[in-house]
Amino acid sequence: MCKHLSLTPLAFTVAAAFAINAPVWAHGDRHPVTHPASHSGGLHTQATKQAAKPAFDIVHTRITTEGNIATFHMAVSGRAGVTRPTPSGKLAGSQVFSYVWPTSLDPSTVGFDAKSGILAFAVTSHPDFDDTPLFDESGDGQATNDGHVWHSHWVVLQPDEACGKGALKVVDIPDGTKPRLPKTWPGLPILIDSPGWSPRFSRDTVEVRVPFDDIGVVQAASFDGVTAALRVNASVHNPLLCVVNVFKVASGDLSLPGKVQP
């Protein structure tokens, strides 16, 4: 695992990802918000004219704290959460749509090994597989068929050329290794946590309330906002989950300029 990962390769990765601009098949993109709510603090981003995916066209990103709770907030020019991947019927090659908050937090903050990559909080939807085995998000009595329902993760990211030039992946766990993992790790061979914090969607906004043992670490952190598509490797092998299309970056360059508001 990378022991000294800086923001420089991360910024390069995002620029490369924009250049890749892989096509993504989806439905439900056009749901304009005619009276978007006002958003204060955090990062404000210009709406994209005639955005191809307004549900992922970031206009505001923020993290605030109250007590030991951090609220991850993102607003878009369309209706948040209305667009999900089109089911493919199989795991291999399937897609994940995401709202992501890359942070300066060390991965050890949430139970991974220290300095193991870039810690990001994410809200995702992927109809072809379920990675929250402890939770029944749809309330149908089955905990293994809810991948299409928007849900939250912590992920650790690193660049990997196997995903494409300058592309990011969720860090793989090599065979025979036993890295430190959160108690709610879903059993996949990647650095991912499924903590069960439920996202709340309202018109143009998605928010998630997340408790922390040490809120001071969060208050000292910086962040950015990203919307992106990821894809499961067609061979279902390392690298298992790659970022294949970045829809938008709040700062434009992934410099993590956002400051957490106490």
Give the ranges of each region predicted by the language model.
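Extracellular/secreted glycoprotein ectodomains characterized by long, lumenal stretches
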Residues: 27, 83-93, 200, 218-228
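Acidic/polar low-complexity flexible segments
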Residues: 27-31, 105-109, 220-262
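Short helix-loop boundary/capping segments
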Residues: 158-211
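Bacterial N-terminal signal peptides that target proteins for export
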Residues: 1-10
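Sec/Tat signal peptide C-region and signal peptidase I cleavage site
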Residues: 22-26
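Bacterial N-terminal signal peptides
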Residues: 9-19
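N-terminal low-complexity, Pro/Thr/Ser-rich intrinsically disordered segments
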Residues: 27-54
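Surface-exposed, glycine/proline- and aromatic-rich loop segments on solvent-exposed faces
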Residues: 53-158
